[in-house]
UniProtKB/Swiss-Prot annotation:
A Gene Ontology molecular function term of the record: electron transfer activity
PANTHER family: FERREDOXIN, FERREDOXIN-2, CHLOROPLASTIC
This protein's name: Ferredoxin
Cofactor names: [2Fe-2S] cluster
Binding site for [2Fe-2S] cluster: C42, C47, C50, C80
Residue span, 2Fe-2S ferredoxin-type domain: 4-96
Protein's job: Ferredoxins are iron-sulfur proteins that transfer electrons in a wide variety of metabolic reactions.
Cited Gene3D superfamilies: 3.10.20.30
The keyword Iron-sulfur is annotated on this UniProt entry: yes
Protein's UniProt keywords contain Transport: yes
Amino acid sequence: MASYKVTLINEEMGLNETIEVPDDEYILDVAEEEGIDLPYSCRAGACSTCAGKIKEGEIDQSDQSFLDDDQIEAGYVLTCVAYPASDCTIITHQEEELY
């Protein structure tokens, strides 16, 4: 089992935290365990409340069912069902930017 450094950033929220996330745990779950307050609703990859945008790195979000191919190509990620596949940086609180 690999573990990756996931950096969660959002200038407006004053967020810049790096956490270690195993490749078999969701980013949102580990962030919560570390005391980082991120938005969420369904926790099942079926809405956009937890949306973030990948700035660098790779993630696996094959469990999600909400984002379309264009949104995924643009780098959007649902943190509630995203596993890290490399060290990565994610801009959080991106639900409004999706639309």
